Swiss-Prot record:
Subunit: Probably binds directly to helix 1 of the histone fold of histone H4, a region that is not accessible when H4 is in chromatin. Self associates. Associates with chromatin. Component of the CAF-1 complex, composed of Caf1-55, Caf1-105 and Caf1-180; within the CAF-1 complex, Caf1-180 interacts directly with both Caf1-55 and Caf1-105. Component of the NuRD complex, composed of at least Caf1-55, Mi-2, MTA1-like and HDAC1/Rpd3. Within the NuRD complex, Caf1-55 may interact directly with Mi-2, MTA1-like and HDAC1/Rpd3.
Keyword Transcription: yes
One Pfam family matching this protein: CAF1C_H4-bd
Similarity-based family: Belongs to the WD repeat RBAP46/RBAP48/MSI1 family.
Highest classification ranks of the organism: Eukaryota, Metazoa, Ecdysozoa, Arthropoda, Hexapoda
Protein name, per record: Chromatin assembly factor 1 p55 subunit
Keyword field: Chromatin regulator, Nucleus, Phosphoprotein, Repeat, Repressor, Transcription, Transcription regulation, WD repeat
Any one GO biological process: eggshell chorion gene amplification
Function field: Core histone-binding subunit that may target chromatin assembly factors, chromatin remodeling factors and histone deacetylases to their histone substrates in a manner that is regulated by nucleosomal DNA. Component of several complexes which regulate chromatin metabolism.
Gene3D superfamilies membership: YVTN repeat-like/Quinoprotein amine dehydrogenase
Organism: Drosophila melanogaster
Amino acid sequence: MVDRSDNAAESFDDAVEERVINEEYKIWKKNTPFLYDLVMTHALEWPSLTAQWLPDVTKQDGKDYSVHRLILGTHTSDEQNHLLIASVQLPSEDAQFDGSHYDNEKGEFGGFGSVCGKIEIEIKINHEGEVNRARYMPQNACVIATKTPSSDVLVFDYTKHPSKPEPSGECQPDLRLRGHQKEGYGLSWNPNLNGYLLSASDDHTICLWDINATPKEHRVIDAKNIFTGHTAVVEDVAWHLLHESLFGSVADDQKLMIWDTRNNNTSKPSHTVDAHTAEVNCLSFNPYSEFILATGSADKTVALWDLRNLKLKLHSFESHKDEIFQVQWSPHNETILASSGTDRRLHVWDLSKIGEEQSTEDAEDGPPELLFIHGGHTAKISDFSWNPNEPWIICSVSEDNIMQVWQMAENVYNDEEPEIPASELETNTA
Protein backbone atom coordinates (compact mmCIF):
# COMPACT_ATOMS: atom_id res chain seq x y z
CA MET A 1 0.00 0.00 0.00
CA VAL A 2 1.33 3.44 -0.94
CA ASP A 3 1.59 5.94 1.89
CA ARG A 4 -0.28 8.97 0.57
CA SER A 5 1.33 11.36 3.03
CA ASP A 6 4.75 10.50 1.55
CA ASN A 7 3.50 11.24 -1.95
CA ALA A 8 1.92 14.52 -0.85
CA ALA A 9 5.12 15.61 0.89
CA GLU A 10 7.13 14.72 -2.20
CA SER A 11 4.91 16.71 -4.57
CA PHE A 12 4.94 19.64 -2.13
CA ASP A 13 8.77 19.55 -2.11
CA ASP A 14 8.78 19.43 -5.91
CA ALA A 15 6.45 22.44 -6.11
CA VAL A 16 8.61 24.42 -3.68
CA GLU A 17 11.76 23.54 -5.62
CA GLU A 18 10.11 24.56 -8.88
CA ARG A 19 9.15 27.93 -7.39
CA VAL A 20 12.68 28.52 -6.15
CA ILE A 21 14.13 27.57 -9.56
CA ASN A 22 11.74 29.96 -11.33
CA GLU A 23 12.54 32.81 -8.94
CA GLU A 24 16.28 32.26 -9.39
CA TYR A 25 15.82 32.24 -13.16
CA LYS A 26 13.89 35.54 -13.15
CA ILE A 27 16.65 37.18 -11.12
CA TRP A 28 19.31 35.73 -13.43
CA LYS A 29 17.46 37.04 -16.48
CA LYS A 30 17.21 40.56 -15.08
CA ASN A 31 20.92 40.60 -14.32
CA THR A 32 22.13 39.25 -17.68
CA PRO A 33 23.16 42.63 -19.19
CA PHE A 34 25.55 43.22 -16.29
CA LEU A 35 26.94 39.69 -16.16
CA TYR A 36 27.23 38.78 -19.86
CA ASP A 37 28.47 40.19 -23.16
CA LEU A 38 26.28 37.65 -25.00
CA VAL A 39 23.36 35.38 -24.16
CA MET A 40 21.43 33.39 -26.76
CA THR A 41 18.74 31.00 -25.58
CA HIS A 42 17.25 28.50 -28.00
CA ALA A 43 14.58 25.88 -27.30
CA LEU A 44 15.39 22.71 -29.22
CA GLU A 45 12.62 20.41 -30.42
CA TRP A 46 14.08 17.66 -28.22
CA PRO A 47 16.68 17.84 -25.46
CA SER A 48 20.29 17.22 -26.53
CA LEU A 49 22.53 15.15 -24.27
CA THR A 50 25.59 16.28 -26.21
CA ALA A 51 27.14 19.51 -27.49
CA GLN A 52 30.41 20.19 -29.31
CA TRP A 53 31.48 23.13 -31.47
CA LEU A 54 32.93 22.17 -34.84
CA PRO A 55 36.32 23.78 -35.53
CA ASP A 56 35.34 25.76 -38.63
CA VAL A 57 34.03 29.32 -38.72
CA THR A 58 32.72 31.32 -41.70
CA LYS A 59 33.06 35.09 -41.81
CA GLN A 60 31.11 36.95 -44.47
CA ASP A 61 32.13 40.34 -45.87
CA GLY A 62 29.88 43.17 -44.81
CA LYS A 63 28.14 41.13 -42.11
CA ASP A 64 28.53 41.92 -38.42
CA TYR A 65 28.48 38.24 -37.48
CA SER A 66 30.34 35.00 -38.16
CA VAL A 67 28.76 31.57 -38.59
CA HIS A 68 29.85 28.74 -36.30
CA ARG A 69 28.57 25.16 -36.21
CA LEU A 70 27.66 22.75 -33.44
CA ILE A 71 27.15 19.01 -33.14
CA LEU A 72 23.99 18.17 -31.20
CA GLY A 73 21.77 15.11 -30.83
CA THR A 74 18.20 14.31 -29.86
CA HIS A 75 16.70 12.44 -26.92
CA THR A 76 13.09 11.91 -28.00
CA SER A 77 10.14 10.18 -26.39
CA ASP A 78 9.83 7.13 -28.67
CA GLU A 79 10.13 9.19 -31.87
CA GLN A 80 12.90 9.03 -34.47
CA ASN A 81 16.21 10.31 -33.09
CA HIS A 82 18.76 12.31 -35.07
CA LEU A 83 22.36 13.40 -35.05
CA LEU A 84 22.24 17.17 -35.70
CA ILE A 85 24.54 19.82 -37.12
CA ALA A 86 23.40 23.34 -36.22
CA SER A 87 24.65 26.72 -37.39
CA VAL A 88 24.98 29.63 -34.96
CA GLN A 89 25.47 33.28 -35.93
CA LEU A 90 27.75 34.96 -33.42
CA PRO A 91 28.12 38.75 -33.39
CA SER A 92 31.44 40.38 -34.27
CA GLU A 93 33.15 42.63 -31.75
CA ASP A 94 31.34 45.71 -33.07
CA ALA A 95 27.84 44.18 -32.81
CA GLN A 96 27.59 44.66 -29.07
CA PHE A 97 24.95 43.08 -26.85
CA ASP A 98 22.81 46.07 -25.90
CA GLY A 99 21.61 45.91 -22.32
CA SER A 100 19.50 49.05 -22.70
CA HIS A 101 16.70 47.28 -24.58
CA TYR A 102 14.76 46.05 -21.57
CA ASP A 103 11.31 44.81 -22.48
CA ASN A 104 9.11 45.38 -19.44
CA GLU A 105 6.26 43.27 -20.75
CA LYS A 106 8.42 40.24 -21.40
CA GLY A 107 10.71 40.99 -18.49
CA GLU A 108 13.76 40.38 -20.66
CA PHE A 109 16.43 42.20 -22.60
CA GLY A 110 16.55 42.62 -26.34
CA GLY A 111 19.85 43.34 -28.01
CA PHE A 112 21.78 40.78 -29.96
CA GLY A 113 20.84 37.77 -27.90
CA SER A 114 17.18 37.75 -28.82
CA VAL A 115 16.97 39.75 -32.04
CA CYS A 116 19.59 38.77 -34.60
CA GLY A 117 21.07 35.69 -32.98
CA LYS A 118 20.19 32.91 -35.35
CA ILE A 119 20.43 29.22 -34.52
CA GLU A 120 19.35 26.79 -37.22
CA ILE A 121 19.45 23.02 -37.57
CA GLU A 122 21.19 22.44 -40.91
CA ILE A 123 21.69 18.66 -41.04
CA LYS A 124 19.63 15.84 -39.54
CA ILE A 125 20.88 12.25 -39.76
CA ASN A 126 18.79 9.29 -38.60
CA HIS A 127 20.18 7.75 -35.41
CA GLU A 128 19.44 4.53 -33.48
CA GLY A 129 17.98 5.74 -30.20
CA GLU A 130 19.12 8.89 -28.41
CA VAL A 131 22.58 10.32 -28.99
CA ASN A 132 24.33 9.87 -25.63
CA ARG A 133 27.40 11.69 -26.92
CA ALA A 134 28.78 12.84 -30.28
CA ARG A 135 32.37 13.92 -30.99
CA TYR A 136 34.14 14.84 -34.23
CA MET A 137 37.48 13.40 -35.33
CA PRO A 138 40.19 16.10 -35.01
CA GLN A 139 41.91 15.10 -38.28
CA ASN A 140 38.64 15.29 -40.26
CA ALA A 141 35.78 17.14 -38.59
CA CYS A 142 33.22 15.68 -41.03
CA VAL A 143 33.65 12.32 -39.28
CA ILE A 144 31.58 12.05 -36.10
CA ALA A 145 31.38 9.17 -33.62
CA THR A 146 28.26 8.67 -31.51
CA LYS A 147 27.30 6.67 -28.43
CA THR A 148 23.91 4.94 -28.66
CA PRO A 149 21.59 3.29 -26.10
CA SER A 150 22.86 -0.05 -27.46
CA SER A 151 26.42 -1.33 -27.12
CA ASP A 152 27.39 -0.13 -30.61
CA VAL A 153 29.39 3.01 -31.31
CA LEU A 154 28.46 4.56 -34.67
CA VAL A 155 30.59 6.61 -37.05
CA PHE A 156 29.08 9.04 -39.57
CA ASP A 157 30.72 11.09 -42.29
CA TYR A 158 28.04 13.76 -42.53
CA THR A 159 29.12 14.79 -46.05
CA LYS A 160 27.87 11.38 -47.23
CA HIS A 161 24.36 11.85 -45.86
CA PRO A 162 21.53 14.06 -47.14
CA SER A 163 20.79 17.09 -44.95
CA LYS A 164 17.18 15.89 -44.59
CA PRO A 165 16.87 12.38 -43.13
CA GLU A 166 15.29 9.43 -44.93
CA PRO A 167 11.59 9.34 -43.92
CA SER A 168 11.91 5.58 -43.33
CA GLY A 169 13.94 6.39 -40.22
CA GLU A 170 16.60 3.88 -41.22
CA CYS A 171 19.94 4.61 -39.58
CA GLN A 172 22.86 4.02 -41.95
CA PRO A 173 26.15 4.74 -40.19
CA ASP A 174 29.32 4.64 -42.28
CA LEU A 175 30.87 2.36 -39.65
CA ARG A 176 29.56 0.34 -36.72
CA LEU A 177 32.08 -0.27 -33.94
CA ARG A 178 31.63 -3.43 -31.85
CA GLY A 179 33.21 -4.54 -28.59
CA HIS A 180 31.01 -3.30 -25.76
CA GLN A 181 28.20 -5.23 -24.06
CA LYS A 182 26.33 -2.15 -22.80
CA GLU A 183 25.80 1.55 -23.52
CA GLY A 184 27.88 4.40 -22.10
CA TYR A 185 28.88 8.05 -22.51
CA GLY A 186 32.66 8.48 -22.66
CA LEU A 187 34.12 9.00 -26.14
CA SER A 188 37.52 10.37 -27.19
CA TRP A 189 39.36 10.65 -30.51
CA ASN A 190 43.16 10.57 -30.44
CA PRO A 191 44.38 14.03 -31.55
CA ASN A 192 47.73 12.56 -32.64
CA LEU A 193 46.76 9.23 -34.23
CA ASN A 194 44.26 9.48 -37.08
CA GLY A 195 41.23 7.23 -36.53
CA TYR A 196 42.01 5.98 -33.03
CA LEU A 197 38.83 6.15 -30.95
CA LEU A 198 38.26 5.30 -27.28
CA SER A 199 34.89 4.58 -25.71
CA ALA A 200 33.80 4.03 -22.09
CA SER A 201 30.91 1.80 -21.14
CA ASP A 202 28.55 0.66 -18.39
CA ASP A 203 30.02 -2.83 -18.98
CA HIS A 204 33.12 -1.73 -16.94
CA THR A 205 35.38 -1.70 -20.03
CA ILE A 206 37.08 0.72 -22.40
CA CYS A 207 37.27 -0.15 -26.10
CA LEU A 208 39.85 1.12 -28.58
CA TRP A 209 39.19 1.05 -32.33
CA ASP A 210 41.21 2.04 -35.34
CA ILE A 211 38.55 3.18 -37.81
CA ASN A 212 41.07 2.86 -40.65
CA ALA A 213 41.06 -0.92 -40.19
CA THR A 214 39.30 -2.93 -42.89
CA PRO A 215 35.64 -3.38 -41.92
CA LYS A 216 33.97 -6.78 -41.86
CA GLU A 217 30.62 -7.22 -43.60
CA HIS A 218 27.92 -4.61 -42.80
CA ARG A 219 30.68 -2.02 -42.19
CA VAL A 220 31.51 -3.48 -38.77
CA ILE A 221 34.89 -2.98 -37.07
CA ASP A 222 35.78 -4.94 -33.93
CA ALA A 223 37.70 -3.37 -31.06
CA LYS A 224 41.48 -3.44 -31.42
CA ASN A 225 41.86 -3.58 -27.61
CA ILE A 226 39.51 -3.87 -24.64
CA PHE A 227 40.80 -2.46 -21.34
CA THR A 228 39.36 -4.12 -18.25
CA GLY A 229 40.95 -2.41 -15.23
CA HIS A 230 37.83 -0.82 -13.70
CA THR A 231 35.43 -2.75 -11.48
CA ALA A 232 32.33 -0.60 -12.14
CA VAL A 233 30.68 1.55 -14.82
CA VAL A 234 33.34 3.51 -16.75
CA GLU A 235 31.93 7.03 -17.05
CA ASP A 236 34.50 8.83 -19.18
CA VAL A 237 37.71 8.41 -21.12
CA ALA A 238 40.16 10.92 -22.65
CA TRP A 239 43.32 10.73 -24.72
CA HIS A 240 46.28 12.78 -23.57
CA LEU A 241 46.63 15.74 -25.93
CA LEU A 242 50.38 15.41 -26.62
CA HIS A 243 51.34 11.77 -25.96
CA GLU A 244 49.69 9.53 -28.53
CA SER A 245 49.82 6.38 -26.39
CA LEU A 246 48.51 7.80 -23.09
CA PHE A 247 44.89 8.05 -21.99
CA GLY A 248 42.92 8.43 -18.78
CA SER A 249 39.68 6.85 -17.61
CA VAL A 250 37.33 7.42 -14.65
CA ALA A 251 34.62 5.21 -13.22
CA ASP A 252 32.02 4.51 -10.56
CA ASP A 253 34.73 2.60 -8.64
CA GLN A 254 35.89 6.14 -7.62
CA LYS A 255 39.16 5.65 -9.48
CA LEU A 256 41.17 7.57 -12.05
CA MET A 257 43.34 5.31 -14.21
CA ILE A 258 46.15 6.29 -16.56
CA TRP A 259 46.85 3.84 -19.38
CA ASP A 260 49.68 3.45 -21.90
CA THR A 261 48.74 1.59 -25.07
CA ARG A 262 52.40 0.56 -25.52
CA ASN A 263 51.99 -1.78 -22.56
CA ASN A 264 50.53 -5.07 -23.64
CA ASN A 265 48.63 -5.52 -20.38
CA THR A 266 45.05 -4.37 -21.01
CA SER A 267 43.85 -5.25 -17.50
CA LYS A 268 46.44 -3.25 -15.54
CA PRO A 269 46.79 0.51 -15.97
CA SER A 270 50.11 2.33 -15.51
CA HIS A 271 48.63 4.29 -12.58
CA THR A 272 45.53 3.94 -10.41
CA VAL A 273 44.32 6.71 -8.10
CA ASP A 274 41.53 6.75 -5.54
CA ALA A 275 40.39 10.08 -6.94
CA HIS A 276 37.14 10.91 -5.13
CA THR A 277 34.82 9.74 -2.37
CA ALA A 278 32.03 8.93 -4.87
CA GLU A 279 31.64 8.02 -8.56
CA VAL A 280 34.00 9.87 -10.92
CA ASN A 281 32.00 11.07 -13.94
CA CYS A 282 34.38 13.04 -16.15
CA LEU A 283 37.97 14.04 -16.86
CA SER A 284 39.85 16.55 -19.00
CA PHE A 285 43.55 17.00 -19.82
CA ASN A 286 44.91 20.55 -19.84
CA PRO A 287 45.71 21.62 -23.44
CA TYR A 288 48.68 23.78 -22.37
CA SER A 289 50.28 21.90 -19.50
CA GLU A 290 51.07 18.29 -20.35
CA PHE A 291 51.06 17.02 -16.76
CA ILE A 292 47.82 18.60 -15.54
CA LEU A 293 44.33 17.08 -15.64
CA ALA A 294 41.01 17.53 -13.86
CA THR A 295 38.32 15.07 -12.76
CA GLY A 296 34.69 15.74 -11.76
CA SER A 297 32.66 13.61 -9.39
CA ALA A 298 29.37 12.76 -7.72
CA ASP A 299 31.06 14.00 -4.52
CA LYS A 300 30.32 17.52 -5.90
CA THR A 301 34.01 18.42 -6.35
CA VAL A 302 36.43 18.89 -9.23
CA ALA A 303 39.93 17.56 -8.49
CA LEU A 304 43.18 18.79 -10.01
CA TRP A 305 45.99 16.28 -10.66
CA ASP A 306 49.64 16.24 -11.75
CA LEU A 307 50.68 13.13 -13.71
CA ARG A 308 54.15 13.31 -12.13
CA ASN A 309 52.75 12.74 -8.64
CA LEU A 310 49.27 11.24 -8.67
CA LYS A 311 49.44 10.31 -4.98
CA LEU A 312 48.79 13.94 -4.15
CA LYS A 313 45.61 15.76 -5.20
CA LEU A 314 46.80 19.26 -6.19
CA HIS A 315 43.51 20.98 -5.40
CA SER A 316 39.82 20.37 -4.86
CA PHE A 317 37.34 22.87 -6.36
CA GLU A 318 34.32 23.07 -4.08
CA SER A 319 31.19 25.06 -4.81
CA HIS A 320 28.81 22.80 -6.76
CA LYS A 321 25.73 21.64 -4.87
CA ASP A 322 25.29 18.32 -6.67
CA GLU A 323 26.97 15.75 -8.95
CA ILE A 324 29.39 17.01 -11.59
CA PHE A 325 29.01 15.37 -15.00
CA GLN A 326 31.21 17.45 -17.29
CA VAL A 327 34.56 19.20 -16.93
CA GLN A 328 36.44 20.98 -19.75
CA TRP A 329 39.54 23.16 -19.88
CA SER A 330 39.34 26.37 -21.87
CA PRO A 331 41.07 26.04 -25.27
CA HIS A 332 42.39 29.61 -24.92
CA ASN A 333 43.56 30.00 -21.31
CA GLU A 334 45.83 27.61 -19.46
CA THR A 335 44.35 28.36 -16.03
CA ILE A 336 40.64 28.37 -16.93
CA LEU A 337 38.40 25.35 -16.35
CA ALA A 338 34.62 24.87 -16.41
CA SER A 339 32.39 22.25 -14.79
CA SER A 340 28.66 21.50 -14.81
CA GLY A 341 26.10 19.01 -13.63
CA THR A 342 22.94 18.20 -11.77
CA ASP A 343 22.76 21.48 -9.83
CA ARG A 344 21.79 23.33 -13.07
CA ARG A 345 24.90 25.50 -12.83
CA LEU A 346 28.03 25.82 -14.92
CA HIS A 347 31.02 27.03 -12.89
CA VAL A 348 34.07 28.65 -14.46
CA TRP A 349 37.26 28.38 -12.38
CA ASP A 350 40.57 30.24 -12.55
CA LEU A 351 43.51 28.28 -11.12
CA SER A 352 45.62 31.43 -10.91
CA LYS A 353 43.33 32.72 -8.13
CA ILE A 354 43.71 29.71 -5.81
CA GLY A 355 44.75 30.91 -2.36
CA GLU A 356 44.04 34.60 -2.99
CA GLU A 357 42.87 36.57 0.01
CA GLN A 358 39.15 37.30 0.17
CA SER A 359 36.85 39.50 2.18
CA THR A 360 34.35 37.64 4.37
CA GLU A 361 31.59 38.87 2.06
CA ASP A 362 33.31 37.51 -1.08
CA ALA A 363 34.06 34.20 0.66
CA GLU A 364 30.32 33.66 1.13
CA ASP A 365 29.92 33.60 -2.66
CA GLY A 366 32.54 30.88 -3.10
CA PRO A 367 36.31 30.31 -3.11
CA PRO A 368 38.58 32.89 -4.84
CA GLU A 369 39.17 30.57 -7.80
CA LEU A 370 35.43 30.49 -8.63
CA LEU A 371 35.38 33.07 -11.44
CA PHE A 372 31.77 32.84 -12.64
CA ILE A 373 28.54 30.90 -12.19
CA HIS A 374 26.29 30.56 -15.23
CA GLY A 375 22.75 30.40 -13.84
CA GLY A 376 20.72 30.38 -17.04
CA HIS A 377 19.56 26.74 -16.94
CA THR A 378 16.57 25.49 -14.98
CA ALA A 379 17.34 21.78 -15.44
CA LYS A 380 20.39 19.52 -15.24
CA ILE A 381 23.14 20.53 -17.68
CA SER A 382 23.90 17.51 -19.89
CA ASP A 383 26.96 18.82 -21.74
CA PHE A 384 28.80 22.00 -22.69
CA SER A 385 31.54 23.05 -25.09
CA TRP A 386 34.03 25.95 -25.23
CA ASN A 387 34.03 27.65 -28.63
CA PRO A 388 37.48 27.01 -30.19
CA ASN A 389 37.44 30.23 -32.25
CA GLU A 390 35.88 32.82 -29.93
CA PRO A 391 37.43 33.02 -26.45
CA TRP A 392 35.04 32.79 -23.49
CA ILE A 393 32.01 31.69 -25.54
CA ILE A 394 30.37 28.51 -24.26
CA CYS A 395 27.43 26.45 -25.53
CA SER A 396 25.56 24.54 -22.83
CA VAL A 397 22.56 22.18 -23.17
CA SER A 398 20.14 21.06 -20.48
CA GLU A 399 17.55 18.31 -20.01
CA ASP A 400 14.62 20.68 -20.59
CA ASN A 401 15.43 21.21 -24.33
CA ILE A 402 17.26 24.49 -23.72
CA MET A 403 20.52 25.35 -25.45
CA GLN A 404 22.37 28.50 -24.45
CA VAL A 405 25.29 30.19 -26.18
CA TRP A 406 26.83 32.73 -23.87
CA GLN A 407 29.87 34.79 -22.98
CA MET A 408 30.51 36.27 -19.55
CA ALA A 409 31.13 40.01 -19.34
CA GLU A 410 34.71 41.03 -20.09
CA ASN A 411 35.12 42.76 -16.74
CA VAL A 412 34.66 39.38 -14.99
CA TYR A 413 37.77 37.79 -16.47
CA ASN A 414 39.74 41.04 -16.81
CA ASP A 415 39.36 41.72 -13.10
CA GLU A 416 37.76 45.11 -13.67
CA GLU A 417 34.99 46.52 -11.58
CA PRO A 418 31.61 46.28 -13.35
CA GLU A 419 30.21 49.55 -14.65
CA ILE A 420 27.01 49.02 -12.74
CA PRO A 421 26.85 49.86 -9.01
CA ALA A 422 26.32 46.77 -6.86
CA SER A 423 23.20 48.36 -5.36
CA GLU A 424 21.47 48.03 -8.74
CA LEU A 425 22.22 44.34 -9.15
CA GLU A 426 19.32 42.23 -7.98
CA THR A 427 20.42 39.42 -5.74
CA ASN A 428 18.65 36.30 -4.71
CA THR A 429 17.72 36.57 -1.07
CA ALA A 430 15.54 33.48 -1.14
